């Protein structure tokens, strides 16, 4: 068991570093940061969200989310809307350019996953997918209990 813990720790660490390197290189999403990719994806699936809702779904502090949103507003991908009754309530939604960017990113993501799958033995893919599902559930459960 001790060996398995160490082995999984090393694998998860390498995976995390690989994603960090991918984001820093700007290649993961065509020059778009990974956080921007996730925010665009969440907005494309949910439509208009308040900043609080988007921060919660991203798992980020509101101040961090605000910086990400500011950049995406400047790039013309999303727009802010003030609340009708409460002007302090701010929501965000995709612009037409944001929707186009989301479609581009979705296609890039699919191509990236296809390249990864080509490097795996075809008969192992279902097993890999199921294992990743279990890992994600376990990590999400741990994140939720440590908040």
Predicted regions: what they are:
Residues 2, 6-9, 107-147:
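Terminal interaction helix/tail motif
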Residues 22-64:
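N-terminal helix-turn-helix DNA-binding core of bacterial DNA-binding proteins
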Residues 1-30:
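N-terminal leader segment of winged-helix/HTH proteins
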Residues 67:
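DNA-binding alpha-helical recognition surfaces that contact promoter or target DNA
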Residues 70-127:
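Charged, amphipathic alpha-helical coiled-coil/dimerization segments
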